[in-house]
Curated annotation (Swiss-Prot):
Keywords: Ribonucleoprotein, Ribosomal protein. It holds the Pfam family Ribosomal_L18. This is Large ribosomal subunit protein eL18. Belongs to the eukaryotic ribosomal protein eL18 family. It comes from Pyrococcus abyssi (strain GE5 / Orsay).
Length: 120
């Protein structure tokens, strides 16, 4: 059976954008994130804020190629970019002084991808 990839038009647009930026900026991290987002939905990353709190340091830029969920607590001030956020995850990140942004916003802020950590 032929693999079709994601059917969500917004996700397809994001994957094309990631590949384009990877080629323009000569940065492999965006191509890697595009590849991870192309996976089937049941294999895509789902990261709880407790995991972000456990492994991140204050000021880190984290990319989650999937969903960020609200289980646990977060006390660190981090910038988290992801495909989707649950309402509680977004609220907890912002209450801790961090930012919950889209992957496109992160690329606009940091086109070279320096200092970005991929978390799955």
């Amino acid at each position: 059976m032929k693999r079709t990839g994601p059917t969500d038009p917004n996700l397809r647009r994001l994957i094309r954008y990631l590949r384009k930026k990877s080629n323009e900026e000569k940065v492999k991290i965006w191509k890697d994130i595009a590849w991870r987002l192309e996976r089937p939905r049941r294999q895509r990353a789902e990261v709880n804020v407790s995991r972000i709190n456990r492994y991140a340091k204050d000021g880190d830029m984290i990319v989650v190629p999937g969903s960020v969920l609200g289980a646990g607590k977060i006390e660190k001030k981090v910038i988290v970019a992801a495909w989707k956020f649950s309402e509680t995850a977004r609220r907890k990140i912002e209450e801790a002084g961090g930012e919950a942004i889209t992957i496109e916003e992160l690329i606009k802020r940091n086109p070279k991808g320096s200092g970005v950590i991929i978390m799955e």
